[in-house]
Structures are given as structure tokens and as C-alpha cells.
A protein has these predicted regions:
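Interhelical loop/hinge segments that connect adjacent transmembrane helices in multipass membrane
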Residues: 1-14, 158, 162, 186-193, ...
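Interfacial segments at transmembrane-helix termini and the short loops linking adjacent helices
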Residues: 115-133, 258, 321-349, 396
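Small-residue hotspots at the loop-to-helix junctions and early N-terminal turns
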Residues: 48-56, 131, 258-269, 338-342
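Membrane-water interface segments that mark the loop-to-transmembrane alpha-helix transition
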Residues: 17-29, 54, 63-117, 129, ...
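Hydrophobic alpha-helical transmembrane segments
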Residues: 128-133, 161-210, 374-381, 393-420
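Transmembrane helical elements of multi-pass membrane transporters/channels
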Residues: 16-36, 164-171, 188-208, 220-286, ...
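Helix-loop junctions and terminal segments of transmembrane helices
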Residues: 66-82, 152-153, 212, 271-295, ...
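Membrane-interface junctions at transmembrane-helix termini in multi-pass inner-membrane proteins
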Residues: 139-163, 290-291, 346-373
């Protein structure tokens, strides 16, 4: 076999997976990325501060309302995916649990939101409107999670991604129409996003009804099974739900003006550039290392992490040398953030490598009971010390904390990898694979 033939056989399937990602999930992710960046450029700073806080809080609330419940459908059904009444009953049980979680969490979340934004002096009417949007959208996001899990379970990924693409490109197209008509304001930016979430929820609901063909009945026994499987992940779900938006929450609490909030919100939109590429890790990196012969793992582990590390550091270096490239993306309202934009790109580069390490470690079953525990304890300790000792009213100090947290995550994941090579992987006790669970790093779940 010639070198060219070997190279073709190696790269052809991977390029095919990249093409599938680009034409499916990648389009939806890119559409949402462009939508968010356009809102940064178009909306006034004061309005974008509201936009950023609302959707950051919504992202955390969506994770808190799920706490891993929807991801239990695959493991509980197992190989009985053709037993449609069983699947329908589990979905009905999921929905009833979701209702109880929503009724329990949403009032507390509403109170916390009011306390969070009270320093911004946005007025009772504005905060009430934001709460309405928050609670309505969070509910439909839960509907999407429950019924979207049915499409994944029944391997109807084409329709699953089609709903996302239509919603993403539809909202982006309408935003462009309003922009051409010079009619974009904060209400347009928010309501188009809400419409996207609602359309996705209805799309998944209708498709799941078609796939199942039967109406399920909830049962206490199935609800107990769901909770039994989901409860061990609740602490980490809560932790990552708050961590994903922590920097914006901190600047909202400690910042002196809405411009500081808008600056952090705009800067963190740039994080999503690398997040777009991290979506390919479950498609390319995870199966590549999961199927690799043990003798080849160590060399390829070092090689892949080194190459990716060099590439993302070059990317971060561009931000320090040519910050105007990224400032142009944000628009002229943020031209004063040349050093801050370099810091946020550096943190996103570190987070990308940390996520890559997590993905490889998961593929090789380098997962241990102390892994998440040490991540949570050390991160909370770091953040507690910084909140106590550092003035977090400035954008720059908040970004320094973000870099420190990303570096800590990187070091922990690197330590887990080294430990895995020394001690060995966890013993496989379950036939459930990553495709059944929708493998993604905790950082990606939180940001998503």
C-alpha cells in the first residue's frame, strides 16, 4: 500500500465526518454564532447589556431545569429502542418530572434574577418583561430536550439537525431583514431568539409523536429509575450550569455600569469561535482515540495535544498582535477593548485544549471518581479567594479570573491523563456508548 493510499484511507472518513458536521450541526452553530455577533454590532451598548444578561442566565437555567434528566432516556431504554410503548412511557415520565422541576426551580430562579439585576436599575417593567421571556423560553427549551432525546434515540439525526438549521437560519434571516429595514432593536433581537426556541420545541414534539406513534403514560417506577440514574450527575450539572456564565454574572453583580456588562457579554461572544470547532471533537477525536490500539495511544495523545496546543496558541497570539481583527467583529462600540479582547481569546484557547483533553480522556476511559470532585472543589476555592481578595468591578480583572479558571481546568485534565497512563482506564461496566449519551464535555454543555 502506497503512502498516498494510506493517507487517503486515513483522511477520507474523517473529512466525510467533517462534511456531515458542516452541513448539519455546523450550519446551525454557525448561524447562532453570526446572529449573536450581529446583535453585538447592531444593538446599543445599554440594550446589549440586557440581551447578554438575559440569555446568559437563560443558558444556566436551561441546564438547571434538565440536570441530566433527558440524557437518561438512552441508557434506560437500552437495546429496546424498537419497543415504542416503552419509549413513549419513559418520555411521558420525563415530561412529568420536567414539569415538577420547572415548578420548583423557576420561582427561585425568578427571584435570583431580580436580585442579580437590581444594581443595574433597569426598572420594574423591563425586568418583568425579561422574566416573562426567561420563563417562557426555559419551558420550551425543556420541551426540546425531552423530545429531542427521542430523535437521537431513534437515530433520526437528519431531522434533529434540520430543525436546528431551520431555526438558526430562519432567525438569522429575519434579523437581516429587520436590519435592512433599519428596525432592529432589543425586542427584535430577543423575540427572534425566543421564536427559534419555540419552533424547535414544536418541531421535535411533532417528529417524536410521529416516530413513536403511541401516547405514553408516566409511572412512578419509571420516574424513580430516571432519578436514580440522573441524581449522581446533579451536583456537577449545577456546577457547570453556573460556571458557564459566571464571568457575566460577576460583572453584573460587581460592575459599576451597564457598559461593563455589555463589554463582557460582547467579548465572550468571541469564545464561540473556538466553540464551533470544539463541536467536532465528539465526531473526530472521540472515536479516533476510542478505537485506537493501546500501544499507539501515548504517542498520539502527546502528538494531537501538542499540535492543537500550538495552533490555538498561534490563534491567541494573533489576538495580542492584531487585536483589531477581533475588534472589527465586535464593532466600533468596543474599540477600546484591545487588551481585553486578547485576554478573552487566550482564555478560549486554554479552554479549547482543556476540552480536548477531557474528550480524549473520556475516549480512553480515563474517568475517575475524584476527577469531577477535584474540579469542583478547586474551582470554587479559586473563585472564592478571588472574589474575597480582588476587585471584580473591572472587566480586566474578571477576565484574569477566567484565564486562571481555564488554566486550572487544563491542569486537572492533563493530570487525569497522566494518571490514566500510569494506573490504567476504568473497567467497562456498561455497554452504553458515547453515541447513545450525546458525548460532550461539561464545558460544552455549560456554554451551549
Amino acid at each position: 500500500m502506497t503512502t498516498i493510499t494510506r493517507a487517503r484511507d486515513f483522511f477520507a472518513p474523517k473529512l466525510r465526518h467533517v462534511a456531515q458536521f458542516t452541513t448539519r450541526q455546523g450550519i446551525a452553530v454557525a448561524g447562532n454564532l453570526v446572529y449573536g455577533l450581529l446583535c453585538v454590532r447592531i444593538l446599543p451598548v445599554a440594550d446589549y447589556a440586557k440581551f447578554a444578561v438575559l440569555f446568559a442566565y437563560m443558558g444556566s437555567l436551561t441546564v438547571l431545569l434538565d440536570v441530566g434528566i433527558s440524557s437518561t432516556l438512552g441508557p434506560l431504554v437500552g437495546e429496546q429502542i424498537d419497543n415504542l410503548p416503552l419509549v413513549a412511557n419513559y418520555v411521558a415520565s420525563l415530561r412529568r418530572l420536567a414539569l415538577w422541576v420547572y415548578l420548583g426551580v423557576s420561582p427561585l430562579a425568578a427571584i435570583c434574577f431580580v436580585l442579580l439585576v437590581q444594581k443595574q436599575h433597569w426598572g420594574a417593567a423591563v425586568v418583568a418583561q425579561m422574566l416573562l421571556v426567561l420563563l417562557v423560553t426555559a419551558w420550551f427549551a425543556r420541551v426540546s430536550s425531552s423530545y429531542g432525546a427521542v430523535l437521537i434515540l431513534r437515530r433520526d439525526r437528519a431531522y434533529y439537525y434540520r430543525v436546528q438549521i431551520i431555526g438558526s437560519l430562519g432567525s438569522l434571516g429575519l434579523l437581516l431583514v429587520f436590519w435592512l429595514l433599519h428596525s432592529v432593536n432589543i425586542y427584535v433581537g430577543i423575540l427572534l431568539n425566543v421564536a427559534q426556541d419555540i419552533s424547535m420545541a414544536f418541531g421535535y414534539f411533532r417528529r417524536s409523536q410521529h416516530l413513536l406513534g403511541v401516547k405514553g403514560e408516566p409511572s412512578a417506577q419509571q420516574e424513580r429509575a430516571i432519578l436514580h440514574l440522573a441524581m449522581p450527575n446533579v451536583p456537577s450539572s449545577i456546577f457547570y450550569a453556573t460556571q458557564g456564565q459566571l464571568m457575566l454574572i460577576l460583572i453584573t453583580i460587581f460592575g459599576h455600569s451597564a457598559s461593563s456588562v455589555a463589554n463582557i457579554g460582547a467579548l465572550f461572544r468571541l469564545n464561540q469561535i473556538l466553540m464551533f470547532f470544539s463541536q467536532m471533537n465528539p465526531i473526530l477525536v472521540h472515536p479516533f482515540f476510542a478505537r485506537m490500539q493501546e500501544a499507539r495511544v501515548r504517542r498520539n495523545y502527546v502528538l494531537v495535544v501538542s499540535i492543537v496546543g500550538i495552533l490555538v496558541m498561534v490563534y491567541a497570539g494573533l489576538a495580542f498582535l492584531y487585536p483589531w481583527l477581533f475588534l472589527w467583529i465586535l464593532g466600533p462600540k468596543y474599540n477600546s477593548l484591545s487588551f481585553e479582547v486578547s485576554l478573552v481569546i487566550l482564555s478560549s484557547a486554554i479552554q479549547y485544549v482543556a476540552g480536548l483533553l477531557w474528550m480524549i480522556n473520556s475516549a480512553r476511559r480515563f474517568t475517575y471518581w475524584w476527577n469531577n470532585l477535584s474540579q469542583i472543589i478547586l474551582t470554587l476555592l479559586l473563585e472564592g479567594i478571588v472574589v474575597w481578595k480582588v476587585d471584580l468591578s473591572t472587566v480586566r480583572n474578571v477576565l484574569y479570573l477566567n484565564i486562571a479558571g481555564a488554566t486550572l481546568t487544563l491542569l486537572i485534565n492533563l493530570g487525569v491523563g497522566i494518571y490514566g497512563f500510569i494506573v490504567g482506564p476504568q473497567k467497562l461496566e456498561s455497554p452504553i456508548g458515547p453515541d447513545d449519551l450525546g458525548m460532550a464535555s461539561p464545558e460544552e454543555h455549560a456554554a451551549g
